[in-house]
Amino acid sequence: MDPIPHSITRTLSRFRTELTSESGSLAIHELEVAEYKASASLRYLACLVGLPWVIPISLRKGLEPWVTNWWNTGKSHQIFDYLQEENALGRFEKIEELFLLERMVEDSSGTHSQDLRIEIHKETIQLVEMYNEDCIQIISHLLTNLIGFAFISAYLILGKNQLAIINSWIQEFFYSLSDTMKAFLILLATDLCIGFHSPHGWELMIDSISENYGFAHNERIISGLVSTFPVILDTILKYWIFRRFNRISPSLVVIYHSMNE
């Protein structure tokens, strides 16, 4: 059998070398692309966490002088009169009752009656100033929240690629865990958010949101939301766990229900 010509062996050797170098450069390129995507996604996640805190502070400082000037023109008071009139009247009645009770305990005289009128007048002026400041704060918070919500929504829409990468990381980390650890994490998250010991947290959150948007504290509405909303979330979550994990990992569903009991 004739030996293979040197030209063919040199050609094969050169082809192997080029293929190896191309594979190495391709691997390096893929690694650089992966590192870039990872760093971009982490920056995006950091911005997504920080924006809800930074946007309200920065916007409120810029909007509050404009809102104060707009409100003090006197043409806009009727907009929020319906929302705050009941609160203002309630405060005024309480102040008047306290002063009357205080003066009834003391000896009645003309000077005391005059002092009572002066003090009620001072408290009324303070009440009007408080009412004016409350309305300005409500409008500022409302505008800030609306602008911030629009900005964050646009940020989420424009960052679909980064969200997809972050979602893939979370899924990869979650599915790499054992079924027992998965069930533990799901149970921990559900108990913290919608468990039997979470109603007080829901009350604080709903009350804070209502005050931020200028709504008066209403115990009935808060109690109704606390007694129904977490139950609805719990039902939806259990249905999602059953539908999603019953096909992927039936043992996870069994472990979750066993730990939940």
Swiss-Prot record:
It catalyses: K(+)(in) + H(+)(out) = K(+)(out) + H(+)(in). InterPro entries: CemA. GO terms for molecular function: antiporter activity; proton transmembrane transporter activity. The chain crosses the membrane at residues 138-158, 184-204, 221-241. GO terms for cellular component: chloroplast inner membrane. It is a multi-pass membrane protein. One of its GO terms (biological process) is potassium ion transport. Keywords: Antiport, Chloroplast, Hydrogen ion transport, Ion transport, Membrane, Plastid, Plastid inner membrane, Potassium, Potassium transport, Transmembrane, Transmembrane helix, Transport. It is found in: Plastid, Chloroplast inner membrane. It comes from the Eukaryota. Belongs to the CemA family. This is Potassium/proton antiporter CemA. The gene is cemA.
